[in-house]
């Protein structure tokens, strides 16, 4: 995983994308056991993960995927709690963002505060991010303790266990396939991103 990100970080952008055949074992892998009931396109990440920061905020791969998804299909993002510090707290905070429908407002400041400025170190710092994003303090506190948020936390934890997640960032399709970044063409960033997106689209249509 580290190697792929070091290479991607050194790539000069190129606009000469090349179509590539998508095959099992290369751009994606079929899970040994499929998991029913998961979102059709599911990304796992952690605000504590430097590679997730690059994936989201530097290369904007998730944004490219979202733009290219067919109508009616959405990208769902789950936070993992196995990366510290505050892994479990950040997962619950992400559940609050999901419940309030403000994931896009929260994602950037949390990533920046943890990975770049290192100004987020406590639960109070996380709470302040929500308040700065326009959430009333009492609304945040109520959501934090709500049944909906607790259910979303459990949902994220269950998906991690059911899919036997090994690391982040990771993207799954239909509970059957995981995208394999190590098998992507990394001759340029544009080629890599295009192939990543095309792999997702291919897997959505795959029976």
State each model region's role.
Residues 47, 53-127:
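Structural alpha/beta surface segment adjacent to cysteine/selenocysteine redox centers
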Residues 63, 91, 95, 108, ...:
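Solvent-exposed, polar/charged alpha-helical surfaces in well-ordered, non-transmembrane soluble domains
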Residues 3-84, 199-207:
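Extracytoplasmic thiol/disulfide redox context detector
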Residues 42-47, 91, 179-184:
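Acidic/histidine-rich, surface-exposed loop or edge segments in extracytoplasmic proteins
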């Amino acid at each position: 995983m580290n190697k792929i990100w070091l290479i991607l970080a050194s790539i000069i952008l190129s606009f000469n994308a090349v179509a590539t055949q998508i095959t099992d074992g290369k751009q994606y892998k079929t899970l040994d056991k499929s998991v029913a009931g998961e979102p059709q396109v599911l990304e796992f990440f952690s605000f504590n993960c430097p590679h997730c920061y690059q994936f989201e905020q530097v290369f904007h791969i998730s944004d490219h995927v979202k733009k290219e998804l067919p109508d009616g299909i959405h990208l769902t993002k789950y936070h993992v709690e196995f990366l510290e510090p505050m892994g479990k707290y950040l997962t619950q905070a992400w559940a609050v963002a999901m419940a309030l429908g403000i994931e896009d407002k929260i994602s950037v400041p949390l990533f920046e505060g943890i990975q770049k400025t290192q100004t987020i170190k406590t639960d109070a710092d996380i709470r302040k991010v929500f308040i700065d994003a326009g959430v009333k303090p009492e609304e945040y506190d109520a959501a934090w303790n709500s049944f909906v948020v607790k259910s979303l936390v459990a949902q994220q934890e269950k998906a991690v266990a059911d899919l036997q997640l090994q690391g982040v960032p990771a993207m799954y399709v239909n509970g059957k396939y995981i995208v394999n970044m190590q098998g992507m063409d990394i001759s340029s960033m544009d080629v890599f991103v295009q192939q990543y997106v095309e792999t997702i689209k291919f897997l959505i249509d795959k029976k």
